[in-house]
């Protein structure tokens, strides 16, 4: 038993070390990003002034037509994505009869799909075309219920990879558009602060809702359908608003 514990500890230590190395590499790569040349006025260090400034920035980004669309999408995506990571584990164990380690490979398949989708979006979608991918949000929501009919792990790998691919291709242009509007309206750092608050609030809210549904013994099938319905409903509203903004008034 002690030997097994030591082996497990070695695996955890190695995993943590690998994560630290990756974070270090990411931090080092930031050193090679060229500065924009812009010089911003110093920010006040008074707490109330900081809060008031943050609230003004928050409203500026949410009231901007393109800013609100891209912020809505990225906020939704990260909340759904975090919930989906846990849901995939439960689904794989209950419906595919995989153990936890095997189920984690489906999370890896999703990550591979996201990376591939992000790379394709960076190659094929220009900034002025960013809103063209909004329909993929509906597609992602429509793909989720397919999980209910999957019974083989091979099919599950293909489906989770496809979900990641669609998600990566969908969110990267939206994130680029959000960063662009943030720089135009505010500054890079201030817009990222607004984005992080919204996305983390979305993750917390959806994790709380997911935990609450589990507490009341909701079935995996019901959780999948709720997540799909949320994705489709929000994206339909975002698309409708975007179409209204594009349609010239009479």
Predicted stretch roles:
Residues 71-72, 104, 134, 189-193:
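Conserved glycine-rich helix-kink/hinge and helix-boundary motifs of the Major Facilitator Superfamily
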Residues 1-3, 69, 77-85, 110, ...:
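Substrate-agnostic recognition of the 12-TM MFS/MFS-like secondary transporter fold
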Residues 35-72:
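Juxtamembrane intracellular "pre-TM" segments in multi-pass secondary transporters
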Residues 3, 116-130, 214:
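Helix-to-loop junctions at the C-terminal end of transmembrane segments
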Residues 138-152:
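C-terminal ends and interior cores of transmembrane alpha-helices
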Residues 1-19, 90, 94-96, 204-227:
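Transmembrane alpha-helix termini and helix-breaking/packing motifs in multi-pass membrane transporters
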Residues 3-17, 59-116, 155, 169:
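A single, central transmembrane helix in multi-pass transporters
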Residues 12, 16-46, 239-249:
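Helix-loop junctions on the cytosolic side of multi-pass membrane transporters
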